Amino acid sequence: MVATARHIKEKDPEARVVFIGPCAAKKLEASRTYIRSYVDFVITFEELAGMFDALEIIPEELEESPIEFTATGAGRGYAVAGGVANAIEKCINEYYPGTEVKIQHAEGLAECKKMLTLAKAGKLNGYMIEGMGCPGGCVAGVGTIIPV
């Protein structure tokens, strides 16, 4: 979120950057002083659906407009549990073939806490850890509107 927002603001300082996603924690992240200047608003899918309902907007009835996708599949997978680590592993394998990559994953706060405790004690078999607070990853966050 922040890297994309920073890139947009560098290209157009007057742009309004709105992050829309299922993750309620992004609201807290965007309120941090060093991020606030890049991200103007954070809206969950649930909040967006509420806005559509209040304004009687039915997305399925709107005219489609062409979208230019420039993101990689690896980048779009960030929000799924294991997605960040998977993207990093793909990059390492591409730029440094033959390099061993040891990754540990955790989903849910209890599992993340357990993994961090093991890492702190030196009992984790991996040198990169990825923890997703929500089981299933960000796509299954509290602000989602469909089951994942």
Task: Kindly give the residue locations of the regions a language model identified.
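Iron-sulfur-associated redox domains of electron-transfer enzymes in respiratory
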Residues: 1-148
